[in-house]
């Protein structure tokens, strides 16, 4: 039987998503470090390595062995645990999610007030930016989501300068990341920034993977 401290679950619709946490391995830390995120920040961001996922539906429980690189993102909106399972190298199921559009990644970790804040497209990018610039960062469930006006108003009351920092899909026929960023920027009167095309890196974590932490710090200073 799984111990509760190593076991998270969240009811979602008619199914329940659960996972079992395992110990961190050297290859896990190497993977995350390559994107500018260290173990202390993984712990801060409630990112956990996992060995199994479980789905209960119609009173039947299904067990799935997680891939080698498999992680759970935990969020605690209003005291309710939600899970997002991330398998970055999977060709079958990269994501599983028990949350909904109202759940923001890293919301619980935000300081009460601050000078600057990034709104990114993923927890990975948010943690990368936060660790390497010490500027708080959060993310929605994806770039295509539209936040509530009340949530944006709260963020504006807490942070003096907010920046939308979505993907620059420079290598796609349509740059959806830029389109979403421009839409939110216009809708909520928040400036947006992106990785310049010349770097051929779509987001902050990919940028660190290609150019390193120090180069990211330099770029952010130029962009804001």
Residue ranges and their predicted role:
Residues 1-79, 109-112, 220-224:
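TOPRIM metal-binding catalytic domain and adjacent DNA-binding surface shared by DnaG-type primases
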Residues 18-21, 116-117, 171:
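Residue-level marker of alpha-helix boundaries and capping positions
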Residues 23, 40, 103, 206-207, ...:
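Residue-level preference for alpha-helix termini and adjacent loops
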Residues 24, 41, 45, 55, ...:
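Compositionally biased, low-complexity repeat tracts
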Residues 53-160, 176:
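Phosphate-handling DNA/RNA-contact segment within nucleic-acid enzymes
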